[in-house]
């Protein structure tokens, strides 16, 4: 079932076991944050300023590095970009974007500013909408190694995690319903 985003201006289909984090805590107006109900996985959708100074293929890397900075994973060896590839228009519902880019990488991040760092695979899809001076960034955080000293170490080992295919289903289903969201 399609879930409304940003007051119904966008929508997407999410995997089962999704929790809307805005029901638990305050989320910035430019973000929608969802978490797996039993794992530390999350999917974040952000409306960001269009980065006109960055070419399309490099824009995905630009936003990844910005997220790495927010995650305090900016030192050498704490993040890597594995692949950046264009998503064919035929594979997405967001027909208003000039291009879409899928990036896969990893970051060493700590939860709640803890010392213990977890290895998180980060998959991002960047939808470029220059006509609205907006980049839509969708991020799938998929922890693959949890440090034994992390507060996440006591996680549910029986939980069925989301897959990359689940994330691709979300990004393929993202639709713009009301361009007024861009101001």
UniProtKB/Swiss-Prot annotation:
Its main location: nucleus. Gene3D superfamilies: Mog1/PsbP, alpha/beta/alpha sandwich (3.40.1000.10). Keywords: Cell membrane, Cytoplasm, Guanine-nucleotide releasing factor, Membrane, Nucleus, Protein transport, Transport. Residues 23-66 are annotated as: Interaction with RAN. Pfam families: Mog1. SUPFAM superfamilies: Mog1p/PsbP-like. It is found in: Nucleus; Cytoplasm, Perinuclear region; Cytoplasm; Cell membrane. The keyword Zinc-finger does not apply. One of its GO terms (cellular component) is plasma membrane. Monomer. Interacts with ran. May regulate the intracellular trafficking of RAN. Promotes guanine nucleotide release from RAN and inhibits binding of new GTP. Plays a role in the regulation of the levels of GTP-bound RAN in the nucleus. Required for normal expression of the ion channel hcn4 and for normal expression of the cardiac transcription factors nkx2.5, gata4 and hand2 during embryonic development. Required for normal embryonic heart development and normal heart rate. This is Ran guanine nucleotide release factor. It comes from Danio rerio (Zebrafish).
